[in-house]
Amino acid sequence: MINLIEIRRQLHQIPEIGLEEHKTQKYLLTIIHQIIQNKSFIQVETWQTGLLVYLKGSQGQKTIGWRTDIDGLPVEELTNLPFASKNGRMHACGHDIHMTVALGLLEKLSESQPKNNLLFLFQPAEENEAGGKLMYDGGAFKNWLPDEFYGLHVRPDLKVGDIATNEQTLFAGTCEVELTFVGTGGHAAFPHTANDALVAAAYFVTQVQTIVSRNVDPLDSAVVTFGKMEAGTTNNIIAERAFLHGTIRSLTQEVNELTQKRLTELAKGVAQSFDMTIDLKLKQGGYLPVENNPKLAKELMDFFRNETKANLIDIAPAMTGEDFGYLLSKIPGVMFWLGINSEAPLHSQKMQADEGVLDFAVEAIGQFLDIKANRN
């Protein structure tokens, strides 16, 4: 039997950025081969730094998928844990917990050959490159494409035993925005001979806020945030270029596309009014809204509602993004939050998970997947 806490701590020490998860993949393969030895009904495939583990069912009428992400973040860990990472990277989003739970589920569900097929997906690059989309579009699933897909994300402000989801949209769709205004630089004393890109960018940032207040239905949800601005070199030089880096978030793809459209129109309009040019990049890629399948979500929620050790919460959507949304746009499935009882939030340098979640998750989720895997 694998040691979940030891595995989690080993994974916690080797976080890697998306599509660079070579040590992570090697470690996962070591544990997976321990689990599946002498089990001829299991196959393993690699895809770049990702992994697929396929359990062929004795009847194989359908394939049930379980997805976990495996990448870390470019964050310096400040937890002071004895097993803290020391490479300027950190599993600050809890993907070490995700992977460990997946390995525990694989061990539990491979004790005997299931009736239905099972696919365990260890997906790279959730944080930066929408690895789920890359794998799907790249043909990684081959003949193993699931009929139903399930996955989780840890949530610090929920307690161990809490499972939270809903029958609709769980996470927002996101779109990264990169916008550069290009004017004409000059001396601060002679603004009439220059064309100030900083002023244009600042004007745009204030105007873009009207998209949510005046173009989006008040009953819908959207966020437009610019968190980074770079312009100029010193106090007495008018900036020739101004760069803005932001994000669009919405609970439906329709609203996201509307917001992208209006942002583009505003950027072009501001550029024209200031007699400038712009370079605009909108990068949504695979970060679509995470839309749960209502029927499958109800089934999962009913199961955990009746589990004595689980506390099922019907939770409102969150504006966080997740590339599992792309896979769920292709395959019906469900994502849910898993409580880990951490005082520090996701992406924090001090985020710590209660390791008691490991045994709970493997036992509770394992029972649910066992029913799915062995249902006629």
Curated annotation (Swiss-Prot):
GO biological process terms, semicolon-separated: diaminopimelate biosynthetic process; lysine biosynthetic process via diaminopimelate
GO molecular function, one term: N-acetyldiaminopimelate deacetylase activity
Reaction(s) this enzyme catalyzes, per UniProt: N-acetyl-(2S,6S)-2,6-diaminopimelate + H2O = (2S,6S)-2,6-diaminopimelate + acetate
EC number(s) on file: 3.5.1.47
InterPro entries registered for this protein in UniProt: AcetylDAP_deacetylase (IPR023905), Amidohydrolase (IPR017439), Bact_exopeptidase_dim_dom (IPR036264), Peptidase_M20 (IPR002933), Peptidase_M20_dimer (IPR011650)
Pathway connected to this protein: Amino-acid biosynthesis; L-lysine biosynthesis via DAP pathway; LL-2,6-diaminopimelate from (S)-tetrahydrodipicolinate (acetylase route): step 3/3
Annotated keywords: Amino-acid biosynthesis, Diaminopimelate biosynthesis, Hydrolase, Lysine biosynthesis
Positions of the catalytic residues: D69, E127
Entries under NCBIfam families matching the protein: amidohydrolases (TIGR01891)
HAMAP family: DapEL
Role according to the record: Catalyzes the conversion of N-acetyl-diaminopimelate to diaminopimelate and acetate.
Family as reported in the entry's similarity comment: Belongs to the peptidase M20A family. N-acetyldiaminopimelate deacetylase subfamily.
Protein name, per record: N-acetyldiaminopimelate deacetylase
Biological classification of the source: Bacteria, Bacillati, Bacillota, Bacilli, Lactobacillales
